[in-house]
Structures are given as C-alpha cells and as structure tokens.
Amino acid sequence: MLEVARQTGAHVIFSSSSSVYGRNTQLPKDESMWLGPMTPYAASKLAAEGYVQAYASAYNVPTTLLRFFNVFGPRQRPDHEYAAVLPKWIWLAMQGQPIDVYGDGTASRDFTYVETVLDIAMTAMKEKVTTDGAMNLAYGNRIFLNDTIAMLKKHFPDLKVNYKENRLGDVKESQNAPGLLKSLFPAITPKPFEAALAETVDWLKEFGQSVANGPKTLD
C-alpha cells in the first residue's frame, strides 16, 4: 500500500492503536511518550507505524497516522473472540447473559465513538490534514468500567456481572491528552459518551443479528 502511495502520490490514512503505549502507565497519554507494546498485536501496530513514518520522511508520502483508543459504535460485530468490550457486553445483555469483567471494574478506558473516528478520517482526507508522526484519537474522557456498567443497567436493569482475575497483557488504564487532536481538527466535537452508548444499544437491538456470526452470504 505504501509503495503504491509513493508511486501515485496518494494520501495514506493509517489506523494504529493506543495499545502501543502498553507498559507505559503514565496518564494521560501524549504522543511524545515512550512506547512499550505488551502483545503481538500492539507490536505489529508499532512496526506498521514505523513503515508509515519512514515513507513519509523518505519519499514525502502524505500520511495521517491515527492511534485509536477503544473505538465503539454501530456495525461493530459483538460476538467473536476479539470483539470490543462494549458491543460484546451489550450483546450478552440482550441475550440475558452475564458479562465478564477482568479485575474489579476500576480499569478505565478513553472510549471513542465510531462517528467521531469517521469525522476525523473524512476531514483528514478532504482537507489533506497530515500528521508529523502519530496522533492519538481520543478526547481525554476517562471512563471507568464500573461506571459504564451502571450506564448499561439503565438499558438492562437485570444485568449480571462476573468479576474475574485480571488477564495477562491487559492495559488497566487509558486516557489521552487530546491537545494535538484538537489543534489539527478544531471543528470536530465528540458526542457525549452516554449518548453514544445509548445509540449503540439501540442499533444492536435493532440490527445486531445482521452483524453477529460473521458476514452473510446470499444464495
């Protein structure tokens, strides 16, 4: 992809992950911090970032390198092994099944609504916004898992929660310092988390079956 972009002058928008911070527990995260991937997935994202930045510096390929923080929202598959936590929890709640929380629920995430991610990516494409290195894509809203569960119980009053041992490789806390994001995309305002969560619940209730169990084939 990068080689084609070098040859054609195409603008590359690459999706990386906040998981590249890994062992760095300092909060909030900013783009100048040291990186310490804790999983092969995170390491692969960091390696890809290196290629993107190398093509930008060596060949002047226009690039926008976005580090996503816990993206959620409609059309996200809720039922596979690596499903994101929010659609997975909502899907289980819809089936009347308990949700699993690894740890005591005091872990935090800087959730980012997919609508906001789309706005950022489309603006970068249309206005040719590039980054000098990576840019964290989250607005600094540190949401604790227990608070998220309390919000979900407004939609699923009988929701049951199983608290389990922490998993090896899980990041306990996540929060972005959004200064660079706001300076590059000043016109974009994220939807409040609870409103975005409610929209996600409504979408999964109406359309969840269409994305569960993988892609469908037509006869």
Language-model features and meaning:
Residues R23-T25, P74-Q76, K172, L180:
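Short beta-loop-alpha junction of Rossmann-like oxidoreductase domains
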Residues E31-S32, E81-A84, G179-L180:
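Short, hinge-like loop/turn segments at secondary-structure boundaries
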Residues P40, A48, Y82, L145, ...:
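Conserved donor sugar-nucleotide recognition element shared by glycan-biosynthetic enzymes
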Residues M1, V52, W89, L181-K182:
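Structural element of the ATP-grasp superfamily
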Residues M1-V71, A198, D202-W203, F207, ...:
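N-terminal Rossmann-like NAD(P)+-binding domain of SDR-like oxidoreductases, especially those catalyzing
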Residues M94-D219:
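C-terminal substrate-binding subdomain of Rossmann-fold SDR/epimerase-dehydratase oxidoreductases
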Residues S44, Y82, S174:
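Short, conserved glycine- and acidic-residue-centered signature motifs
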Residues Q26, G50-R109, V114-T123, A150-H155:
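NAD(P)-dependent short-chain dehydrogenase/reductase
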